[in-house]
């Protein structure tokens, strides 16, 4: 086994990030499983929250997800947050061998309700709470298979969202919402926030404590020249995401439908190098925080304050060479 592999790196990363002031660390389900690294990180950290950002829901049954989440909640001392996403049809069918029988929203709704029923049954073995829906059912919980109660049974639930349906669903049933980076600041303010509030009102909840997690792109560097180079890199990322038709609702909100169609056509033709030029400076400002390191904290606050409760930031490469730089940025972000 390679001791310098991805999971070994995550162990070191978690302890390092906690030490310089990050409030939490999250894992994406990309090349590796989203859950296993967090068990490792939980053993190496004491304070920071640990979450999936996000785990793909449908390839796993609610019971499989619930068991992993329950163990992580217990082992981490209540620091685990469960973030779930649907992915798109092609990935479910062609990569995960998972059927896509209908629109994902109603299925995610049942998935969350089923999870809640399973968690309640774990915590109260003598009084199981069952669930039966169109897509998911949980109607059996023998004592032998019940992990039993834990000290922190309220596992915070998050879903990823780009459109209003999932945003309403999160407001109704979840503790938070993890925005996709394709969500612009204006689309979030105009579409996502009202949808979350509507979902919270439907369930009689107060949305004030809801954790709306933003994930803006960062175009940053030590000098203005570094920032300009980072802007070009971010344009490539934005162009890639904006070429996906599933995300064109965000572009339509800004009147950028034609840009989305052109980006999609270029991607189909394999003309990837031509795509970033379609992302204008005005577009970039709606998707990204652009600033040198010394102005980054103020720039993030200017874009995020009053909109996001939590902001996901990628650990800056410079931080490994200049820890004080990252620590100071985080300190200023934490200031009231």
Task: Label each region the model flagged.
Residues 1-336:
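Active-site-adjacent structural elements that line small-molecule/cofactor binding pockets in enzymes
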